[in-house]
Design a protein with these regions (language model features):
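Flexible loop/hinge segments that line or gate small-molecule binding clefts
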Residues: 67-73, 106-138
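Short secondary-structure boundary segments
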Residues: 45, 103-104, 179, 209, ...
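Proline-aspartate-enriched helix->loop->beta-strand connector
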Residues: 38, 85-104, 119, 217-231
Length: 290
């Protein structure tokens, strides 16, 4: 099986007089994370909770962060609140044998304290689709679900390749993705959302921004003439989104009523549901071509 960034060597240790294989992978900070048999896993980021579920490891999870809300079964687990507010002591009190965290969503000082206490910590920061798949593979290795989840991960990645093959060669459609309205925020070219737009044959009008997210101006959006306006949210959010931009009827996207929302979380949360979001984005961009 193709494994990304997994260490080729298997470390052998001794437990109760028997040899036990310890799986080692590198996390997204290039730190080596080794575990023998994960049984008490703390997951402190929503995208990681969804990935653990996708690879079949939820039976080993003892608690999650407060924002994890998918799958529905996660709501039966203890929720620890905002990881930024958690100290190492409160995490250690749960007696985890593996902690999964988002680099942008936790203090790295806390991570260092956990590692000093002997707890393996996997730090995640996927920015591209392939990196999400890599995270799936590495976590499945740590959780002991590698064999039964391998084909599912391959199929997930293949669906993106199929979308690119179907839409990638079509006429390019300029797209503005809105993260927030006040202040007006968007995502740059380093985020997976930009990659999704591109594989659908679109172009993020702020692909040139070096940061993952940035504040922009209405004038800047108008100048780049998007043909699709895109955001994440509910039906109620969609109506607000449409009304927000109705004051600029000269914008191609507004003039042609190409203003869309995708359901909350699935596009900006770099996890398994990203493929469902990508299919919606491709359909919206295709509609703008007609």
């Amino acid at each position: 099986m193709k494994c990304i960034r997994l260490l080729a060597a298997v470390c052998l240790t001794w437990l109760s007089g028997q040899a036990v294989a310890a799986v080692c992978v590198q996390d997204d900070t290039n730190q080596t994370v080794c575990i023998q048999q994960a049984q008490r896993v703390l997951v402190l980021a929503p995208h990681l909770t969804e990935i653990v579920d996708f690879v079949g490891g939820m039976s080993k999870v003892i608690a999650v962060d407060g924002s994890s809300n998918f799958p529905e079964s996660v709501n039966t687990l203890p929720k620890l609140g905002n990881p930024w507010m958690l100290g190492a002591e409160s995490i250690l009190a749960r007696k985890p044998d593996l902690v999964l965290v988002w680099q942008s969503g936790i203090s790295m000082e806390v991570v260092a304290q956990l590692r000093k206490a002997g707890v393996p910590v996997f730090v995640s920061e996927p920015k591209k689709i392939e990196q999400v798949a890599s995270t799936m593979r590495r976590l499945s290795a740590l959780l002991g679900t590698e064999q039964r989840s391998a084909s599912r991960i391959d199929d997930w990645l293949q669906q993106f390749k199929s979308l690119r093959a179907e839409y990638g060669g079509r006429s390019i459609v300029p797209v503005f993705y809105q993260v927030w309205s006040q202040p007006l925020m968007t995502l740059g070219g380093q985020h997976a959302v930009s990659e999704v737009i591109e594989l659908c044959g679109g172009r993020n009008i702020f692909v040139d921004l070096p940061n993952l997210a940035a504040q922009v101006s209405v004038e800047g959006v108008l100048k780049r003439k998007p043909e699709v306006l895109l955001a994440s949210g509910s039906e109620r959010d969609h109506q607000s989104f449409v009304m927000q931009w109705a004051s600029w009827p000269q914008m191609p996207a507004v003039k042609r009523n190409q203003v869309y929302t995708v359901p909350n979380d699935i596009l900006v949360r770099n996890g398994p549901r990203l493929i469902g979001a990508a299919k919606l984005v491709c359909a919206h961009i295709e509609q703008a071509r007609r």
